[in-house]
């Protein structure tokens, strides 16, 4: 509470507090210090120019409840620039030194931020009288110089700016001494100071209650010590002795004008009054109540409001205590979590140690196996060598035999043994290689584990109550990696980075329609990179991604725009064209096609179009037979064993050496002169903005628009048979047609 009892200017406990019209308080001395003389044309302290509404002062008498001083009544204030009016009042009790001259104060809200106006439309003009028996009236309409359209009260001699709300108050010659004494604040300060047990500072033992304090010496005295140590003579005679705070006597509120007890309260003027005041003209027809009844009602209302505020304060106190308890719990929880992380890391380290022992044991076992195999092979080779050496030595000894009959007895056998040994030696010994490599042909794949260690991190858990099962929170937002995203032809690749501190079960990638329309899901899975094919050409696609887990879905990432190619690049698609059994022969990276049989076969391009303008050409590489190749577009389910245009799924132009026809659903029409030979070019222009199909032969239009009202997805198509070879050229700009 002590902060409420300190002056905003001197920061000390209030001394002789006075009440401003804005209901803020100041020490009387501080108010005297900060009030400034005012004269028309002078600058206002803290005021800025503006265009705010003006406030005109009213007039009336206000009866104060101060010690012997009169007051003035709150007057209604009319805003000349608007319809709003308001009554403002406050208790008035001037000091004994107050003059008999009335004063008028005008308050204004000062807005330092936008510098629009220093006066609010709700501000009021107040007439304050010191000790007068007549109402004081100021009816001036002059503008306050330098403050826009604010009406300056005539006769203003002083002004003061409230240090708290920056409202401006004007006074007459009496200045701030016309302000009422803030008796409630004064009493509260006295009671607050009385708690400090103000004792005499000069008593040697058992200090008595101080009765006076010297303002110059700043020492408290009881009556006995004052007579002994601070006599009122000599230099001490000029010192001022006052009662210490807390020693104020209870004073009865009396009317400053009639010296009568204030027993009534005017609800219209919102001011206390005595019995004589009620009988005067200014309170005629006003609603009047007993001052005790009004005081009791306001105390009851204040008590009720205080009870509600006390409940909130109690709740806030409990909340603060809970926060303090949570601080302790945070420390305890963090210590427990540190122990858990330490234990988990130790478990991981132990798992790595166990795995290391397993891997080392596997290496030792592999070593033992290889050594055993090599020893077995060495033993086998040694045995073979010993047998061969024994045979050689035996043969040498046999060659020493001089008895021909004896040698011939075994000669054939030895020749066969040596020959067989020599033949098998090449297989068993000469070409024999070590059965195992002396080099360990293994390597430790630790890249995945290293990445896992690098990615080892915390995941955010969902906040739960004590005792509830903890589970991961919904994941945070993934981050799209622009450097890893790309667009090629009619496909886009989007890559993203997993969110930090989140448990993710999967991702959802969404694309719009390439025209800023609604998003649709194109991928759902655990990968962090995705390529989407089959998009429109020359379109800007916006992509976004979000993560999800069992707890819910996270927020979408920021958008990334990817532009597909302006013109289409494609080839023939052997699979869409019927596969290996179609009889079509593709070459030059599927750009050239031919066929062996006499039956027409349809070849389709690798992309389908549903939007945009697209153009491609065919070059006739070989045209030796009397046949009619057909060029155009088809749907994906076109009949592949008929000439293009024979069914309702295809739109084509078939042409020979002299002329051409347009054909759809076996209906051919509009013959156009002009055919093809080897080296001719056929151009196909598919305009899905106008939904038309046109053809060109040798870069010249072949008739007018061939087909109209084409909607859906169409694939480039051609049908040929034996004797025709052609090559398709794509990624070409569409020619300008002048017959549209």
Curated annotation (Swiss-Prot):
Zn-finger (B box-type) residues: 195-244, 250-291
Pfam families, alphabetized: fn3, SPRY, zf-B_box
SUPFAM superfamilies, A to Z: B-box zinc-binding domain, Concanavalin A-like lectins/glucanases, Fibronectin type III, RING/U-box
Pathway: Protein modification; protein ubiquitination
Residue stretches of biased makeup (Gly residues): 64-73
Annotated positions binding Zn(2+) 2: 255, 258, 277, 283
Keywords: Cell projection, Coiled coil, Metal-binding, Neurogenesis, Repeat, Transferase, Ubl conjugation pathway, Zinc, Zinc-finger
EC category: transferase
Subcellular location: Cell projection, Axon; Perikaryon
Free-text disruption phenotype from the record: Defective axonal patterning of terminal processes in class IV nociceptive sensory neurons (C4da), including defective contralateral projections in ddaC and vdaB neurons, during larval development. Defective larval locomotion behavior. Defective targeting of R8 photoreceptor growth cones to the medulla layer during eye development.
CDD domains hit by this protein: Bbox1_TRIM9-like_C-I (cd19803), Bbox2_TRIM9-like (cd19764), FN3 (cd00063), RING-HC_TRIM9-like_C-I (cd16576), SPRY_PRY_TRIM67_9 (cd12889)
Record-level GO cellular component terms: axonal growth cone; neuron projection; perikaryon
B30.2/SPRY domain sequence ranges: 549-736
Family membership noted in the UniProt record: Belongs to the TRIM/RBCC family.
UniProt-recorded name of the protein: E3 ubiquitin-protein ligase TRIM9
Annotated organism of origin: Drosophila melanogaster (Fruit fly)
